[in-house]
Amino acid sequence: YLSYAISISTVIVAILGPVLGAVADHKNRKKPLFTFFMMMGVLGCAGLALPSGIIAFLAVFVIAKVGFSGSLIFYDSMLVDVTTDERMDEVSSQGFAWGYIGSCVPFVISLGLILGADQIGLSGTAAMMIAFAINAAWWGLVTIPLLRNYKQNYYVESKGHITAKQSLSQLAEIFGEIRNDRKVLLFLLSFFFYIDGVYTIIEMATSYGKDVGISDTSLLLALLLTQIVAFPCAILFGKLTKQFETGSLIMVCIGAYFCVAVYALWLDAA
């Protein structure tokens, strides 16, 4: 059922994404749209802490996932507004690195609650519910500095209220330009298949791990270790962009990712 919920949320974002992106290109639109989807994700995450049946839980999960994925549409595009082309790789890698290590704070707290639930008089379900609430609160709090300081510097000038027709017209124009630019078209197609595979592995890794016999505790610790290892690696690759082409480094990472994924495919037991 989890895979169906993930697929539904992905389809929703895929449909909304191009239109939302076109709207966000206009002046002072990016931050409000980001805030809306971020709050949808935060409230959805908090909603997962409420007791409910499997269907209600999955419905709230879809809302949270759409909020999270939708917010990334605008969050990722903010990079051009906060740095220069020369520093883009470095700033991006620093953002990923500190995001990875920062996420360990609520993760460790939640992990302590879940693994030590019996010692502090909590049921496993109660500990999990509190963990969802903690992560929702953390998500909302760490977004405040961005909301206070971000300013959209690059935008499309528009006269008056932006209509859906204008956004669709702009979108059609963009698609026309993409169709006539072979490099951009190939890049977008490649990125679509690449990122779809990456996110599928990330989101289904724990389910796959359970199927091959890895315990819940081991899976949680593995996820935590992944975040910790990702911190120095992100910084390292940011520095390597000064010595090597970004495209070459990306190919190295994709190659390593592919090898690990193929190896995992043949696992039949932990």
Model segments located where?
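Hydrophobic core of transmembrane alpha-helices in multi-pass small-molecule transporters
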Residues: G44, I54-S71, A270
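C-terminal ends and interior cores of transmembrane alpha-helices
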Residues: T35-G53, G255-A270
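Pair of pore-lining "gating" transmembrane helices in MFS-fold secondary transporters
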Residues: Y1, V62, G176-I201
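Glycine-rich segments within core transmembrane alpha-helices of 12-TM secondary carriers
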Residues: E90-I114
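Helix-to-loop junctions at the C-terminal end of transmembrane segments
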Residues: I15-R29, P232-T246
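Juxtamembrane intracellular "pre-TM" segments in multi-pass secondary transporters
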Residues: K151-L188
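C-terminal membrane-cytosol helix-exit motif in multi-pass small-molecule transporters
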Residues: P106-D118, A136-V156
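Short amphipathic helix-loop junctions that connect adjacent transmembrane helices
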Residues: Y1, E203-L219, L223
